[in-house]
Amino acid sequence: PQQVRQIATYVYIEMLKAGYTQVAEFHYLHHQQNGRAYDNPAEMALQVRQAAVDTGIGQTLLPVLYSHSGFGGQSPNAGQARFIHDLDAYVRLQEQLGQNIDALKHNQGVCFHSLRAVTKSQIETALTSLPQAWPVHIHIAEQVKEVDDCVAWSGQRPVQWLANEVGFDARWCLIHATHVNTDEVLTIAKSQAVVGLCPSTEANLGDGIFPITDLIAHGGRLGIGSDSHVCVSVAEELRLLEYGQRLRDQQRNRVYSSAQPS
Protein backbone atom coordinates (compact mmCIF):
# COMPACT_ATOMS: atom_id res chain seq x y z
CA PRO A 1 0.00 0.00 0.00
CA GLN A 2 2.75 2.47 0.84
CA GLN A 3 4.41 1.85 -2.51
CA VAL A 4 1.13 2.52 -4.31
CA ARG A 5 0.76 5.79 -2.42
CA GLN A 6 4.30 6.83 -3.31
CA ILE A 7 3.85 5.98 -6.98
CA ALA A 8 0.49 7.79 -7.14
CA THR A 9 2.00 10.81 -5.42
CA TYR A 10 4.83 10.93 -7.95
CA VAL A 11 2.44 10.66 -10.90
CA TYR A 12 0.11 13.32 -9.49
CA ILE A 13 3.04 15.72 -9.03
CA GLU A 14 4.03 15.09 -12.65
CA MET A 15 0.46 15.75 -13.74
CA LEU A 16 0.23 19.00 -11.81
CA LYS A 17 3.51 20.19 -13.32
CA ALA A 18 2.11 19.35 -16.76
CA GLY A 19 -1.01 21.44 -16.16
CA TYR A 20 -3.55 18.83 -15.11
CA THR A 21 -5.65 19.88 -12.11
CA GLN A 22 -8.03 16.92 -11.95
CA VAL A 23 -7.59 13.17 -12.29
CA ALA A 24 -10.16 10.40 -12.76
CA GLU A 25 -8.43 7.48 -11.06
CA PHE A 26 -9.43 4.15 -12.66
CA HIS A 27 -8.46 2.05 -9.63
CA TYR A 28 -8.56 -1.72 -9.62
CA LEU A 29 -5.51 -2.86 -7.65
CA HIS A 30 -7.56 -3.77 -4.59
CA HIS A 31 -6.08 -6.78 -2.79
CA GLN A 32 -2.91 -8.52 -1.68
CA GLN A 33 -0.90 -10.58 -4.18
CA ASN A 34 -2.68 -13.77 -3.12
CA GLY A 35 -6.05 -12.17 -3.76
CA ARG A 36 -6.99 -11.79 -0.12
CA ALA A 37 -8.44 -8.48 0.99
CA TYR A 38 -6.41 -6.30 3.31
CA ASP A 39 -7.64 -5.97 6.91
CA ASN A 40 -9.15 -2.73 5.69
CA PRO A 41 -10.73 -3.69 2.33
CA ALA A 42 -10.42 -0.07 1.18
CA GLU A 43 -6.70 0.14 2.03
CA MET A 44 -5.37 0.53 -1.50
CA ALA A 45 -8.05 2.97 -2.61
CA LEU A 46 -7.50 5.09 0.47
CA GLN A 47 -3.77 5.23 -0.27
CA VAL A 48 -4.52 6.54 -3.76
CA ARG A 49 -6.94 9.08 -2.33
CA GLN A 50 -4.35 10.21 0.21
CA ALA A 51 -1.88 10.78 -2.61
CA ALA A 52 -4.39 13.21 -4.11
CA VAL A 53 -4.80 14.95 -0.75
CA ASP A 54 -1.03 15.20 -0.27
CA THR A 55 -0.41 16.70 -3.71
CA GLY A 56 -3.51 18.89 -3.93
CA ILE A 57 -4.81 17.50 -7.21
CA GLY A 58 -8.56 17.12 -7.58
CA GLN A 59 -9.60 13.49 -7.85
CA THR A 60 -12.57 11.46 -8.97
CA LEU A 61 -11.88 8.04 -7.46
CA LEU A 62 -13.26 5.25 -9.64
CA PRO A 63 -13.03 1.90 -7.84
CA VAL A 64 -13.33 -0.73 -10.54
CA LEU A 65 -15.73 -3.67 -10.44
CA TYR A 66 -13.84 -6.59 -11.95
CA SER A 67 -15.34 -10.06 -11.43
CA HIS A 68 -14.78 -12.20 -14.53
CA SER A 69 -12.17 -13.05 -17.15
CA GLY A 70 -14.40 -13.08 -20.21
CA PHE A 71 -17.86 -12.46 -21.62
CA GLY A 72 -20.69 -14.43 -20.07
CA GLY A 73 -19.31 -14.48 -16.54
CA GLN A 74 -16.21 -16.63 -17.08
CA SER A 75 -14.25 -17.41 -13.91
CA PRO A 76 -11.30 -15.11 -13.21
CA ASN A 77 -7.77 -16.47 -13.52
CA ALA A 78 -5.02 -16.43 -10.90
CA GLY A 79 -3.31 -13.41 -12.41
CA GLN A 80 -6.43 -11.32 -11.84
CA ALA A 81 -6.77 -12.19 -8.13
CA ARG A 82 -5.78 -8.73 -6.89
CA PHE A 83 -8.53 -7.09 -8.91
CA ILE A 84 -11.55 -9.27 -8.14
CA HIS A 85 -14.67 -8.25 -6.24
CA ASP A 86 -18.12 -9.75 -6.13
CA LEU A 87 -20.93 -7.22 -6.29
CA ASP A 88 -21.68 -7.11 -2.55
CA ALA A 89 -18.04 -6.47 -1.65
CA TYR A 90 -17.83 -3.79 -4.34
CA VAL A 91 -20.86 -1.92 -3.03
CA ARG A 92 -19.49 -2.09 0.52
CA LEU A 93 -16.17 -0.70 -0.74
CA GLN A 94 -17.92 2.19 -2.45
CA GLU A 95 -19.99 2.94 0.65
CA GLN A 96 -16.88 2.95 2.85
CA LEU A 97 -15.03 5.26 0.47
CA GLY A 98 -18.02 7.60 0.36
CA GLN A 99 -17.64 8.41 4.05
CA ASN A 100 -15.82 11.59 5.10
CA ILE A 101 -15.02 12.64 1.55
CA ASP A 102 -14.03 16.25 0.86
CA ALA A 103 -16.66 17.09 -1.75
CA LEU A 104 -14.91 20.33 -2.71
CA LYS A 105 -11.82 18.53 -4.02
CA HIS A 106 -12.78 14.91 -4.43
CA ASN A 107 -15.53 12.99 -6.16
CA GLN A 108 -16.36 9.33 -6.57
CA GLY A 109 -17.84 7.25 -9.36
CA VAL A 110 -19.07 3.87 -10.50
CA CYS A 111 -16.64 1.99 -12.68
CA PHE A 112 -16.83 -1.27 -14.61
CA HIS A 113 -13.58 -2.63 -15.99
CA SER A 114 -15.20 -3.83 -19.23
CA LEU A 115 -18.15 -5.83 -20.48
CA ARG A 116 -16.03 -8.96 -20.33
CA ALA A 117 -15.33 -8.42 -16.61
CA VAL A 118 -18.89 -7.90 -15.36
CA THR A 119 -22.36 -9.25 -16.07
CA LYS A 120 -25.50 -7.39 -17.02
CA SER A 121 -27.07 -8.00 -13.62
CA GLN A 122 -23.95 -6.67 -11.88
CA ILE A 123 -24.05 -3.47 -13.93
CA GLU A 124 -27.75 -2.94 -13.27
CA THR A 125 -27.53 -3.64 -9.54
CA ALA A 126 -24.46 -1.45 -9.06
CA LEU A 127 -26.16 1.43 -10.84
CA THR A 128 -29.28 1.16 -8.68
CA SER A 129 -27.35 0.60 -5.42
CA LEU A 130 -25.02 3.59 -5.70
CA PRO A 131 -25.73 7.34 -5.97
CA GLN A 132 -27.35 8.37 -9.23
CA ALA A 133 -25.28 11.56 -9.38
CA TRP A 134 -22.00 9.67 -9.65
CA PRO A 135 -20.26 9.45 -13.03
CA VAL A 136 -19.95 6.02 -14.66
CA HIS A 137 -16.82 4.81 -16.47
CA ILE A 138 -16.17 1.70 -18.53
CA HIS A 139 -13.45 0.53 -20.93
CA ILE A 140 -15.19 -0.62 -24.10
CA ALA A 141 -14.38 -1.77 -27.65
CA GLU A 142 -10.70 -1.00 -27.20
CA GLN A 143 -9.40 -3.81 -29.40
CA VAL A 144 -10.74 -5.86 -32.31
CA LYS A 145 -10.59 -9.09 -30.29
CA GLU A 146 -12.93 -7.62 -27.69
CA VAL A 147 -15.43 -6.76 -30.41
CA ASP A 148 -15.15 -10.20 -31.99
CA ASP A 149 -15.54 -11.97 -28.63
CA CYS A 150 -18.58 -9.85 -27.76
CA VAL A 151 -20.24 -10.65 -31.10
CA ALA A 152 -19.51 -14.36 -30.63
CA TRP A 153 -21.06 -14.26 -27.15
CA SER A 154 -24.07 -12.00 -27.71
CA GLY A 155 -24.50 -11.37 -31.43
CA GLN A 156 -23.89 -7.67 -30.76
CA ARG A 157 -20.89 -5.35 -30.75
CA PRO A 158 -19.84 -3.96 -27.32
CA VAL A 159 -21.27 -0.43 -27.63
CA GLN A 160 -24.34 -1.84 -29.37
CA TRP A 161 -24.85 -4.35 -26.54
CA LEU A 162 -24.42 -1.72 -23.82
CA ALA A 163 -26.89 0.62 -25.52
CA ASN A 164 -29.51 -2.08 -26.06
CA GLU A 165 -29.17 -4.07 -22.84
CA VAL A 166 -28.33 -1.41 -20.24
CA GLY A 167 -28.39 2.05 -21.83
CA PHE A 168 -26.10 5.00 -21.19
CA ASP A 169 -26.45 8.76 -20.97
CA ALA A 170 -24.48 11.91 -20.22
CA ARG A 171 -23.16 10.60 -16.88
CA TRP A 172 -21.27 7.83 -18.69
CA CYS A 173 -17.71 7.96 -19.99
CA LEU A 174 -16.88 5.31 -22.58
CA ILE A 175 -13.12 4.85 -22.43
CA HIS A 176 -11.40 4.20 -25.78
CA ALA A 177 -14.46 2.98 -27.77
CA THR A 178 -11.91 2.60 -30.53
CA HIS A 179 -13.70 0.09 -32.71
CA VAL A 180 -17.20 1.43 -33.33
CA ASN A 181 -19.29 1.52 -36.47
CA THR A 182 -21.36 4.39 -37.84
CA ASP A 183 -24.52 3.40 -35.96
CA GLU A 184 -22.63 3.17 -32.68
CA VAL A 185 -21.07 6.61 -33.17
CA LEU A 186 -24.53 8.06 -33.72
CA THR A 187 -25.87 6.27 -30.62
CA ILE A 188 -23.04 7.65 -28.49
CA ALA A 189 -23.54 11.18 -29.82
CA LYS A 190 -27.29 11.11 -29.16
CA SER A 191 -26.74 9.86 -25.61
CA GLN A 192 -24.24 12.67 -24.85
CA ALA A 193 -21.98 10.15 -23.15
CA VAL A 194 -18.35 11.26 -23.20
CA VAL A 195 -15.86 9.25 -25.23
CA GLY A 196 -12.68 9.12 -23.16
CA LEU A 197 -9.80 8.98 -25.62
CA CYS A 198 -6.27 8.13 -24.50
CA PRO A 199 -4.19 8.78 -27.63
CA SER A 200 -0.74 7.99 -26.23
CA THR A 201 -1.84 4.69 -24.72
CA GLU A 202 -3.91 3.70 -27.75
CA ALA A 203 -0.89 4.39 -29.97
CA ASN A 204 1.48 2.57 -27.62
CA LEU A 205 -0.73 -0.54 -27.59
CA GLY A 206 -1.58 -0.36 -31.28
CA ASP A 207 -5.29 -0.31 -30.49
CA GLY A 208 -6.50 1.72 -33.45
CA ILE A 209 -8.01 5.13 -34.17
CA PHE A 210 -11.41 6.34 -32.99
CA PRO A 211 -13.49 8.22 -35.64
CA ILE A 212 -13.48 11.57 -33.85
CA THR A 213 -14.57 13.63 -36.83
CA ASP A 214 -17.71 11.51 -37.18
CA LEU A 215 -18.56 11.98 -33.49
CA ILE A 216 -18.07 15.74 -33.70
CA ALA A 217 -20.22 15.93 -36.83
CA HIS A 218 -23.10 14.40 -34.85
CA GLY A 219 -22.64 16.71 -31.85
CA GLY A 220 -20.94 14.13 -29.63
CA ARG A 221 -18.65 14.81 -26.68
CA LEU A 222 -15.09 13.68 -26.06
CA GLY A 223 -12.33 14.09 -23.54
CA ILE A 224 -8.70 13.03 -23.31
CA GLY A 225 -6.90 10.98 -20.69
CA SER A 226 -3.55 9.31 -20.32
CA ASP A 227 -4.67 5.82 -19.18
CA SER A 228 -1.32 4.07 -18.70
CA HIS A 229 0.68 7.31 -18.31
CA VAL A 230 2.88 6.54 -21.31
CA CYS A 231 3.24 10.30 -21.31
CA VAL A 232 1.78 13.05 -19.14
CA SER A 233 1.32 15.92 -21.56
CA VAL A 234 -1.91 17.58 -22.64
CA ALA A 235 -0.26 18.98 -25.76
CA GLU A 236 1.14 15.60 -26.79
CA GLU A 237 -2.20 13.83 -26.26
CA LEU A 238 -3.97 16.43 -28.40
CA ARG A 239 -1.27 16.29 -31.06
CA LEU A 240 -1.56 12.49 -31.29
CA LEU A 241 -5.34 12.79 -31.39
CA GLU A 242 -5.21 15.18 -34.35
CA TYR A 243 -2.45 13.32 -36.17
CA GLY A 244 -4.32 10.04 -35.85
CA GLN A 245 -7.28 11.53 -37.67
CA ARG A 246 -4.98 12.96 -40.36
CA LEU A 247 -3.39 9.55 -40.92
CA ARG A 248 -6.79 7.86 -41.06
CA ASP A 249 -8.35 10.38 -43.46
CA GLN A 250 -5.20 11.47 -45.33
CA GLN A 251 -6.23 15.09 -44.79
CA ARG A 252 -5.06 17.95 -42.59
CA ASN A 253 -6.86 19.92 -39.88
CA ARG A 254 -9.39 17.28 -38.86
CA VAL A 255 -10.40 17.99 -35.25
CA TYR A 256 -11.64 21.56 -35.42
CA SER A 257 -14.84 23.58 -35.59
CA SER A 258 -15.79 26.99 -36.96
CA ALA A 259 -15.67 28.27 -33.38
CA GLN A 260 -12.19 26.78 -32.87
CA PRO A 261 -10.55 26.68 -36.31
CA SER A 262 -7.06 25.96 -34.98
Predicted ranges, named:
Residues 19, 23, 52, 110, ...:
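Divalent metal-coordination and catalytic microenvironments
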Residues 128-135, 167-170, 187-196, 217-222, ...:
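Glycine-enriched alpha-helix->loop->beta-strand junction motifs that scaffold or abut catalytic
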Residues 164-171, 213-262:
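His/Asp/Glu-enriched, well-ordered alpha-helical/loop segment
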